[in-house]
Amino acid sequence: MEALVYTFLLVSTLGIIFFAIFFREPPKVPDKGGK
């Protein structure tokens, strides 16, 4: 059942990278309030 774990890890990493790029492209929220 190692294939399942590897697939999950790969999908998770890809998803995180995709989300990061997607949220980085449209800078609508100003970064002046800290968090």
Swiss-Prot record:
Localization per record: Plastid, Chloroplast thylakoid membrane
Species: Thuja plicata
UniProt keywords, alphabetically: Chloroplast, Membrane, Photosynthesis, Photosystem II, Plastid, Thylakoid, Transmembrane, Transmembrane helix
Task of the protein: Found at the monomer-monomer interface of the photosystem II (PS II) dimer, plays a role in assembly and dimerization of PSII. PSII is a light-driven water plastoquinone oxidoreductase, using light energy to abstract electrons from H(2)O, generating a proton gradient subsequently used for ATP formation.
Protein's recorded name: Photosystem II reaction center protein T
Pfam families noted in UniProt: PsbT
Subunit structure: PSII is composed of 1 copy each of membrane proteins PsbA, PsbB, PsbC, PsbD, PsbE, PsbF, PsbH, PsbI, PsbJ, PsbK, PsbL, PsbM, PsbT, PsbY, PsbZ, Psb30/Ycf12, at least 3 peripheral proteins of the oxygen-evolving complex and a large number of cofactors. It forms dimeric complexes.
Topology class, membrane: Single-pass membrane protein
Annotated family: Belongs to the PsbT family.
Native organism taxonomy: Eukaryota, Viridiplantae, Streptophyta, Embryophyta, Tracheophyta
CC per GO annotation: chloroplast thylakoid membrane; photosystem II reaction center
Transmembrane regions: 3-23
